[in-house]
């Protein structure tokens, strides 16, 4: 059983996101450990990219900071290896398609060997006539990495049916239109949207994009099977808070504590 499947067996997981290499290798690893101590059950590690169009200003700046630290594909592997020395937490690579396409299938096997369990490719074309993405899904399968896929409030039925045949581990529901960022509350139609998705998907459904406090996490868990916090953590890293402070902040969001 994949570590991600195990994470959903007894709880509704708290999923955290950090951009790999933000603040440098050592700080990035220390902050990842801090999130684990703060209650995070699954960790997404962002692969820094020069054109992160799906992200809002907070995470865009994190990509820039990480690239200035010379974070590259090897750094991402080393971060995972460092975490695997002491932790069995599920790891998801959060990436744009282009860097992975450029690296080729061999890199996916390197990700698996380093300790990653899944890949979420935010701008991946879902196969219809896109031969490249079809081969990418095949490469993920061969590397034994789960494809984590995104859906939005506007994803149409035909697309949902296609995605339901490909997604594994969990479905990532983008709970707000637009880019990543911090929002004060979930959308008014959140429960309706989750109910709609359950007609198509048997895997767990988690909510992300905008969850930044305990109140929105509680609201998400009323209907979803887990929740993701990203921008709220990344904003703290921009301020160079200590790992201890980051642990405390994560605990303040987690409604299960």
Curated annotation (Swiss-Prot):
Matches recorded under CDD domains: Tryptophan_synthase_alpha (cd04724)
Please indicate which superkingdom the organism of origin belongs to: Bacteria
One CC-aspect GO term = cytosol
What keywords does the record list, in alphabetical order?
A: Amino-acid biosynthesis, Aromatic amino acid biosynthesis, Lyase, Tryptophan biosynthesis
What Enzyme Commission number(s) appear in the record?
4.2.1.20
Q: Which reaction does it catalyse?
A: (1S,2R)-1-C-(indol-3-yl)glycerol 3-phosphate + L-serine = D-glyceraldehyde 3-phosphate + L-tryptophan + H2O
Output the Pfam families linked to this UniProt entry. Answer: Trp_syntA
What GO molecular-function term can you cite, just one?
tryptophan synthase activity
Give the pathway annotation.
Answer: Amino-acid biosynthesis; L-tryptophan biosynthesis; L-tryptophan from chorismate: step 5/5
Q: Where is the active site?
A: 44, 55
Q: How does it assemble?
A: Tetramer of two alpha and two beta chains.
The function of this protein is:
The alpha subunit is responsible for the aldol cleavage of indoleglycerol phosphate to indole and glyceraldehyde 3-phosphate.
Hey, which family's this protein in? Answer: Belongs to the TrpA family.
What protein name is recorded for this chain? Tryptophan synthase alpha chain
Which species is this record about?
Chlamydia felis (strain Fe/C-56)
Protein encoded by which gene: trpA
